């Protein structure tokens, strides 16, 4: 603060919780970063009227008094982007929690603490690309790589605004993130750039164009991959009441999805949930294609913003997370961002809106809730990145929503459903029956089915038909359940009894998945397809056999559903035990066993038909 001029200071006029009003702030900009009070608390200007500025403070404001100084920094709230992001744990405004703990020696974050986001002293191994002195470069060009860890190479890019002719490029060697690695001349002026760049969190990073997303986001959860798929570069919402398993699904996506990396934002969640994530993730490993085990933290960045942290920082944490994701997207990677949960973010907006005395809309939320949600979700997508070499990257956003009492007509849920393309609705009743993941297959939907058809055709040409049959069976079973409750199961036609039997296989043995077992915590797509094919094959063959033997055999005996269950009991047990196939045995082994079961089903039903026709 000593270097600041007197004209850079305003003075506090009023304090109301996280909102501070300051005078003498003429010349300030919207969303400018300020330092409030003697403790230099971080704040951001959110309203300007004349020379009065309204500031939201990202730290605890108790102890601030009228007349305290407010220092303008003349820059927006920004995040530092460079090597060292992966494997790190930040708070909502990108302060590194581990570094703060080391500096302060305390379990709580001290007020006004000023620790650099990325390690300034660590030496990174820089490998320059093919550029030479005299070459012309522009924003987004990859000027070198840094092997950040064994999973990801960090591509060092020029900042988007840069352009000119190279006058110096650093040779291969070890540098910290603030050392000059390239110098560019443009119109007679020289500019120096290092590995680190800053970017304002509220501004989307520039791209050449948005592209159509056509690759599925495989999560390892059968119900999501087969019935309600998301895409890389898509938007998904997971609304559900407390205890439905939102956090488990979010964490499963972080652990097993086919993204290159994950940014997990715990926005206003319980402290012990975030602690569990922080304890679990460093111990988790993922198996690479070449068989080696790697720590999952090597591809993960955590933004931890628990419910007892200042409310204003919740709003910033979402923007921090999406800016980090966009940075890796610009390198040409496919990143996924988990926001758990956007409801807490909306509650932070509501609280600050109330402090500003804005006109409340539905349930007290501000009228601009929908616009803020849309501007956040619209930063997802598959894009052609700026700079050379030409490359594509994507950011997928998965937002958990916690509607009070599981009421999906809540304003946050309604606004979210108007924006996102995939809806994974969690059902309290399924969760109470211990059916997890508790995704309700009757209300959930995905608008990406048509976009993904070419992928499915290539992977397995009859998967689309199999999935359609499975969905019809589940829909029909819901209608039949009402009849069964009125008149009992015995009054149903034989073909309807088969529908109920197939639906049981689908619900109990296919859609339900145990995240805490070795064989079922992650289900590869080939296993999902094989399992669904066998269940649908049973349905088709059983229905066909009953229709063909409707007249009975020479003794007048007809093939009934209970006879099928009695005669093929062992085979049906095999169908229900498919989930126990362990993916670690290898794709060819698992696929071979599932195909054998399919052949056995056809053979046994052929024999049954011969017996009863």
From Swiss-Prot:
Domain of life: Eukaryota
Reactions the enzyme catalyzes: ATP + H2O + 4 H(+)(in) = ADP + phosphate + 5 H(+)(out)
EC code: 7.1.2.2
Keyword flag Zinc: no
Any one Gene Ontology cellular component term annotated for this protein: proton-transporting V-type ATPase, V1 domain
A Pfam family matched in the record: ATP-synt_VA_C
SUPFAM superfamilies xref list: C-terminal domain of alpha and beta subunits of F1 ATP synthase, N-terminal domain of alpha and beta subunits of F1 ATP synthase, P-loop containing nucleoside triphosphate hydrolases
Endpoints of the signal sequence: none
Residues engaged in binding ATP: 240-247
Keywords of the record: ATP-binding, Hydrogen ion transport, Ion transport, Nucleotide-binding, Translocase, Transport
Keyword S-adenosyl-L-methionine: no
Annotated InterPro entries: ATP-synt_VA_C, ATP-synth_a_Xtn, ATP_synth_asu-like_sf, ATPase_a/bsu_AS, ATPase_F1/V1/A1_a/bsu_N, ATPase_F1/V1/A1_a/bsu_N_sf, ATPase_F1/V1/A1_a/bsu_nucl-bd, ATPase_F1/V1_b/a_C
GO MF annotation: an example: proton-transporting ATPase activity, rotational mechanism
GO BP of this protein: ATP metabolic process
Enzyme class at the top of the EC tree: translocase
Quaternary state and interactors: V-ATPase is a heteromultimeric enzyme composed of a peripheral catalytic V1 complex (main components: subunits A, B, C, D, E, and F) attached to an integral membrane V0 proton pore complex (main component: the proteolipid protein).
Family: Belongs to the ATPase alpha/beta chains family.
NCBIfam families (UniProt xref): PRK04192.1, V-ATPase_V1_A
Task of the protein: Catalytic subunit of the peripheral V1 complex of vacuolar ATPase. V-ATPase vacuolar ATPase is responsible for acidifying a variety of intracellular compartments in eukaryotic cells.
HAMAP family xrefs: ATP_synth_A_arch
Protein name, UniProt field: V-type proton ATPase catalytic subunit A isoform 2
Organism: Acetabularia acetabulum
């Amino acid at each position: 603060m000593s270097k600041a001029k007197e004209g850079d200071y305003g003075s506090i006029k009023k304090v109301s919780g996280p909102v501070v009003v300051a005078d003498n702030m003429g010349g300030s900009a919207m969303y400018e970063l300020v330092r409030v009070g003697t403790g230099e608390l971080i704040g951001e200007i959110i309203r300007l009227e004349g020379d009065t500025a309204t500031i939201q403070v990202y730290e605890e404001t108790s102890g601030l008094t009228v007349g305290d100084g407010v220092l303008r920094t003349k820059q927006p709230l920004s995040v530092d982007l460079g090597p060292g992001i992966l494997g790190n744990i930040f708070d909502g405004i990108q302060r590194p929690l581990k570094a703060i703990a080391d500096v302060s020696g305390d379990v709580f974050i001290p007020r006004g603490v000023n620790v650099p986001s990325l390690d300034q002293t660590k030496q990174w191994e820089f490998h320059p690309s093919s550029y030479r002195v005299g070459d012309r470069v522009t924003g987004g060009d990859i000027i070198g790589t840094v092997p950040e860890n064994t999973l990801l190479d960090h591509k060092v890019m020029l900042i988007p605004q840069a352009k000119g002719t190279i006058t110096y490029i650093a040779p291969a060697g070890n540098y910290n993130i603030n050392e000059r690695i390239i110098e560019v001349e443009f119109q007679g002026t020289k500019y120096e750039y290092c590995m680190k760049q800053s970017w304002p969190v509220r501004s989307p990073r520039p791209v050449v164009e948005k592209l159509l997303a056509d690759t599925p986001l495989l999560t390892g959860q059968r119900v999501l991959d087969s019935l309600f798929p998301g895409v890389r570069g898509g938007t998904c919402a997971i609304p559900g009441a407390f205890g439905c398993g939102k956090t488990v699904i979010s964490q499963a996506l972080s652990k097993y999805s086919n993204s290159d990396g994950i940014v997990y934002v715990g926005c206003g969640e319980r402290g012990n949930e975030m602690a569990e994530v922080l304890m679990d993730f460093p111990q988790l490993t993922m198996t690479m294609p070449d068989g080696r085990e790697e720590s999952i933290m090597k591809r993960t960045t955590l933004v931890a913003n628990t419910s007892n942290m200042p409310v204003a920082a919740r709003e910033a944490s979402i923007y921090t997370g999406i800016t980090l994701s966009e940075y890796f997207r610009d390198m040409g990677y496919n990143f996924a961002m988990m926001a758990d949960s956007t409801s807490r973010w909306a509650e932070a907006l509501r609280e600050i809106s109330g402090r500003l005395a804005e006109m409340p809309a539905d349930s007290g939320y501000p009228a601009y809730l929908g616009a803020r949600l849309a501007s956040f979700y619209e930063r997802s997508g598959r894009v052609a990145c700026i700079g050379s070499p030409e490359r594509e990257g994507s950011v997928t956003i998965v937002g958990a929503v916690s509607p009070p009492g599981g009421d999906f007509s809540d304003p946050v849920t309604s606004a979210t459903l108007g924006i996102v393309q995939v809806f994974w609705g969690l059902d309290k009743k399924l969760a109470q029956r211990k059916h997890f993941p508790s995704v309700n297959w009757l209300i959930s939907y995905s608008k990406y089915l048509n976009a993904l058809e070419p992928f499915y055709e290539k992977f397995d040409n009859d998967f689309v038909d199999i999935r359609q049959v499975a969905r019809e069976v589940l829909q029909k079973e819901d209608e039949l359940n009402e009849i069964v409750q009125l008149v009992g199961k015995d009054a149903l036609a034989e073909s309807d009894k088969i529908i109920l039997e197939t639906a049981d296989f689908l619900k109990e043995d296919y859609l339900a998945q145990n995240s805490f077992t070795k064989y079922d915590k992650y289900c590869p797509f080939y296993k999902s397809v094989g399992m669904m094919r066998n269940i649908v094959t049973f349905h088709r063959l059983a229905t066909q056999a009953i229709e063909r033997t409707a007249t009975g055999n020479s003794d007048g005996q007809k093939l009934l559903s209970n006879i099928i269950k009695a005669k093929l009991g062992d085979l049906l047990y095999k169908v229900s035990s498919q989930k126990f196939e362990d993916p670690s045995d290898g794709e060819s082994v698992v696929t071979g066993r599932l195909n054998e079961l399919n052949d056995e089903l056809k053979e046994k039903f052929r024999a049954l038909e011969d017996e009863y026709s």
